[in-house]
Each structure stands twice: as C-alpha cells, then as structure tokens.
Amino acid sequence: MQYQAPGAAPAAALGVGVPLYAPTPLLQPAHPTPFYIEDILGRGPAAAPAPHSLPAPPPPTLPSPNSSFTSLVAPYRTPVYEPTPIHPAFSHHLAATYGTGAYAGPLYSFPRAVGDYTHALIRQDPLGKPLLWSPFIQRPLHKRKGGQVRFSNEQTIELEKKFETQKYLSPPERKRLAKLLQLSERQVKTWFQNRRAKWRRLKQENPQATKKEEAEGTGDHGDPRSEGSPSPAGGGEAEPQDSPSAASQEDPESDVSDDSDQEVDIEGDKGFYSATR
C-alpha cells in the first residue's frame, strides 16, 4: 500500500499540475530522505508551518528527486530573465508612465525596452539638431532660385549714380565700372539695359517729371544718344555697342524686365533679369 502524504492536498488545491516526468534538479539537498514528509514538502526541522491562505499561487518549481509531487523549495528556483537596471535619468519618467496603467498588460512586461529605445535616440542625436534637414537648411544666401544674384546696396548706389549722369556706357567705361564694383561686364550691361527699360516706362507714365530730370541731368552732358559715336573727322567705322539701336538689336527682351533692377540672371544667354510686370 502506498502512503499518501498529507501535503499533497494543498498542492492539488493550488491548481499545480502533476507532471508525468520529473526531471532531476541541478542542486541536491544536503541529506536526501525521500520517505519523510518534511523532505517531500521541503520543510526543514525549524521551518515555520505553511500558511493556510496564500495571496497568489506560486510559480511551478522543480520537483523532488524521487517523488511526483511538486516542491515548494525556493533555492531550486532559477530566474529565467533578470532585467537590467534602468538609468536614473529615465527612472522617474518610466515610473510615471507605467504607474498610470497606460501600458498595462503582458505585452509590456519589460519596461526597460522603452527606456532603451529612448536612450538610443538620444545617443543618436546628442546635440538636438535635425540631421536629415541640415543639407537643406544651409543654403547660400547670396544666390537665388534660377541662378539669380542680388546686388549689394553699395553696388546699387554706384550704379544709380552713374545712370543719373549717363544712360549709356561705352565698352571702356563699362569695363572700368565693372572693375570698380567687382562685377562682370555682362552684369553691368544687363543692369543698365533693365534700368533704361524702367526709365522708359516711367517716362511714359509721367512725362513731365521725366522732362524736368532730363533738363537738370543732361544739360551738361548733352544728348546721351550721341555717347560713343565716332567723330566725322576720325572716320572710324566702329559702331558703339551701347547705343539705343545696338541695345535694341542685341537685347530685344530688355524692355520686358522693367522692375527687376537688382536681380541678374547670370545663367541666361543674354544675361537679363527675370522681371514681373
């Protein structure tokens, strides 16, 4: 007849299944005596009696060597996963997050995963700058879309002063002015072409003010259209490049750009402004 242990009933009442095969534990007890009830239940000679009501069922542990009953000995339990301590900087944040119950459930059983991802993002961007947008933020300010450049205030003032006294420039004068303002001859020529187009438009809108300016500005310099024309005595055959007829033949679109007297399209074939009427 097989002897029934009195401690088997509480084990079955706790809902612990009896395994068909009992593996051998890693650690052996000091004095294995499988015929005593104390050894079967894992109680020592001075151990306190087990409580009648437990708050929660304990996890299943390794059984004893020669019995089919589950053992409740704590030293036989080996932890499967031991979480890494969380960094102190994230401990208060994670405590507040998981304390509210927003991430309650078996899917979020390891809170350290969220802290690891957050810490990885901080290590990736230590300075807090947008790494992906840096090539688009750092753009040159002196150039504009379409290859246009903007004249500085000093260059514009000098060009305006020259235009007040002289509406057309000869090639030597244009070269000298471009060297003085650190511009190309093409930019100076383009600026004067567009400035003359604007001047003609203002002349058509307000002819009285234009006549007054011509009387004051061109009184000492004479007719600007005779600038650069060869003298009859010289007999030269060279034709001025900045004369009104030559400018209209070389640059027929110079009258189109009226208002853009500070932006030059250096990429274009003729070098004129991109104007908006």
From Swiss-Prot:
Keywords: Developmental protein, Differentiation, DNA-binding, Homeobox, Nucleus, Repressor, Transcription, Transcription regulation. Pfam families: Homeodomain (PF00046). CDD domains: homeodomain. PANTHER family: HEMATOPOIETICALLY-EXPRESSED HOMEOBOX PROTEIN HHEX, HOMEOBOX PROTEIN HHEX. Recognizes the DNA sequence 5'-ATTAA-3'. Transcriptional repressor. May play a role in hematopoietic differentiation. GO terms for molecular function: DNA-binding transcription factor activity, RNA polymerase II-specific; RNA polymerase II cis-regulatory region sequence-specific DNA binding; sequence-specific DNA binding. It comes from Gallus gallus. The gene is HHEX. Residues 250-266 have a biased composition (Acidic residues). InterPro entries: HD, HD_metazoa, Homeobox_CS, Homeobox_DNA-bind_prot, Homeodomain-like_sf. Its main location: nucleus. In all hematopoietic tissues except peripheral blood erythrocytes and in the liver and lung. The lineage of its organism: Eukaryota, Metazoa, Chordata, Craniata, Vertebrata. Residues 52-63 have a biased composition (Pro residues). GO terms for biological process: cell differentiation; negative regulation of DNA-templated transcription; regulation of transcription by RNA polymerase II. This is Hematopoietically-expressed homeobox protein HHEX. SUPFAM superfamilies: Homeodomain-like (SSF46689). Residues 210-226 have a biased composition (Basic and acidic residues).
